[in-house]
Amino acid sequence: MGKFKFPSAYTILFFLIAVVAVLTWIIPAGQYHMAMNEALGKDVPVAGTYAHVAAHPQGLVSVLMAPIAGLYDPESGQAGAIDVALFILIIGGFLGIVTKTGAIDAGIERVTTRLRGREEWMIPILMALFAAGGTIYGMAEESLPFYTLLVPVMLAARFDPVVAASTVLLGAGIGTLGSTINPFATVIAANAAGIPFTNGIALRVALLVIGWIICVAWVMRYARKVRQDPSLSIVADKQEENRAHFLGNKDAQTLEFTPVRKIILVIFALAFAVMIYGVAVLGWWMAEISAVFLASAIIVGLIARLSEEELTSTFINGARDLLGVALIIGIARGIVVIMDKGMITHTILHSAEGLVSGLSTVAFINVMYWLEVVLSFLVPSSSGLAVLTMPIMAPLADFANVNRDLVVTAYQSASGIVNLVTPTSAVVMGGLAIARVPYVRYLKWVAPLLGILTVVIMVALSLGAVL
């Protein structure tokens, strides 16, 4: 009998869609009354208004339609995750063209030469940059291109794809967990809770700094072990395969870091800088930043003097490389679609509301944290979870004599830690797919770190409740 092989990300997500569909036949359907929140510009649930509604069980057709509905609603035509999927394909084309020019490989050689003997210091520096993106604007889907960039860098430095993936995922993730001015988490949640988002910022900064130190130490410890003994890598059996995929025959010759390649890397960096500025300052999202990378791909192709045929075929091949990631994003969003159409999202939320009433301050805030953890698995969108839960959960804090800002911190900490591992997150599944790191292996590797971070969060929340 053959050895059991864990299913792919696609199978896991389809299985979760089926499980949630079954739950729509078991969990009673219900809904809160929704009212417009002028500050948010969205309808939000009103506490105390939950009522049962007619059941909307989801069947086989709904399960099969879920990945499609995850990309766009076939009934209304409203976009779902299709903008993110298209962004991924355009990023793939852009990276394909940049890679074709040899600029990335030449740049990698220059970086590794300059950092020879101290490559591990890339880890804290890069994790600090990603954490800044997380805490400032909730860096998520836009972090996916960095996986493709960093894996070859880390492999050339004698690390493994896990080091590259965790540098991005844990870096941006701990930043989001300790969000300070993140408009998609802290600001939305605080507005929904009826408080200024600056309330409680000191505790969030403390969580951010402590969490970053812990994550950096975890990744650097693993990186040193792998560098000293590659057999200790959790993907050691894929070492040659990964080197062939990400580095190709790079070792066969030294690429000259020509002025043209330098210009291409400058454009490469500027594209990401413009993306970050546009999202954080100008309010851009997927359509605008997709256009940035499309324009950048054309500019790079012209500078590299690629022919029209070379440019278009290279772009298409690059997009093809990330097609699987784009599909994962649609499937992951399909889980939430089934929950919403089955009318069980608010029922689960109502059960959570009943559990937190009448508790002590410390018990309340920790129960709140764990409830948000459970809900975060079902609603991986931080802004969606904020709009869904804060209007109901924050008023409950008044009865427990807990400051509302602490509820906001509990929410974003729970959402942040879950989104480091949840299989419903396109960032987790997509990032690991790009780095070719099996999800279950990553989960086992990161589990002790999650335990440490959870203890830190619960201690911080408890201190915040009693001080």
What are these regions (language model features)?
Residues 2-12, 147-237, 254-258, 262, ...:
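Membrane-core helix-loop-helix motifs of multi-pass transport proteins
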Residues 75-85, 113-125, 157-163, 262, ...:
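Membrane-interfacial loop-to-helix junctions in multi-pass transporters
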Residues 88-90, 118-149, 329-339, 355-395, ...:
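Hydrophobic alpha-helical transmembrane segments of multi-pass integral membrane proteins
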Residues 85-88, 119-134, 159-177, 209, ...:
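Alpha-helical transmembrane segments of multi-pass membrane proteins
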Residues 10-28, 88-96, 129-133, 175, ...:
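Hydrophobic core segments of alpha-helical transmembrane domains in multi-pass membrane transport
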Residues 7, 356-467:
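C-terminal transmembrane helix pair
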Residues 1-6, 10, 34-43, 202-314, ...:
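Long, contiguous bundles of hydrophobic transmembrane helices that form the permeation core
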Residues 9-10, 14-18, 43-106, 284-347:
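Core transmembrane alpha-helical segments of multi-pass membrane transporters/permeases
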